[in-house]
Swiss-Prot record:
The active site is at H63 (tele-phosphohistidine intermediate). The phosphoenolpyruvate-dependent sugar phosphotransferase system (sugar PTS), a major carbohydrate active transport system, catalyzes the phosphorylation of incoming sugar substrates concomitantly with their translocation across the cell membrane. The enzyme II CmtAB PTS system is involved in D-mannitol transport. Gene3D superfamilies: Mannitol-specific EII, Chain A. This is Mannitol-specific phosphotransferase enzyme IIA component. CDD domains: PTS_IIA_fru. The modification Phosphohistidine is found at H63. Homodimer or homotrimer. Seems to be a monomer when not phosphorylated. The PTS EIIA type-2 domain is phosphorylated by phospho-HPr on a histidyl residue. Then, it transfers the phosphoryl group to the PTS EIIB type-2 domain. Residues 3-142 form the PTS EIIA type-2 domain.
Length: 144
């Protein structure tokens, strides 16, 4: 899974003022990497209106609606490390993983991310990481 995380799509020490701003940043990174079209960002916001993508342990995993599958060019991930946290429907989120999955691949990605974040130690390591490589290593170890 770490192969879907390029160093260019891992953003350290991000400051955002709102959940909406965090979704926009994650979505823009997916657009910039060529994984999705611009329309996918709105689909990420639309999904959030229907159901929160907060997963617990300081993690949110915004992704597009099922109808937005046509806006996915190839699978991709982006990660925002937000050490100060951002309010996410009353919860504090310190890591946002934006997800775009092609051909149903997002379900596998969601599962692997949830497993990684089920360990509090992994969450702490990601929030405190000083480099993209450190973050990728946490996922590689969890995926082993």
């Amino acid at each position: 899974m770490s192969e879907l995380f390029s160093n260019d799509n891992i953003f350290l020490n991000v400051n955002v003022n709102s959940q909406n701003e965090a979704i926009e940043k994650a979505g823009k990174a997916l657009v910039d990497s060529g994984a999705v079209t611009d329309a996918y960002i709105q689909a990420m916001k639309d999904r959030e209106q229907v159901v929160s993508t907060f997963m617990g342990n300081g993690l949110a995993i915004p992704h597009g609606t099922d109808e937005a599958k046509t806006n996915v060019i190839h699978s991709g991930l982006t990660l925002l490390q937000i050490p100060e946290g951002v309010d996410w429907d009353g919860e504090v989120v310190k890591v946002v993983v934006g997800i775009a999955g092609k051909d149903g691949e997002h379900l596998d990605l969601l599962s692997k991310i949830a497993i990684t974040f089920s360990e509090e130690e992994n969450v702490d390591r990601i929030v405190q990481a000083k480099s993209a490589e450190e973050i990728k290593q946490v996922f590689e170890e969890a995926d082993a």
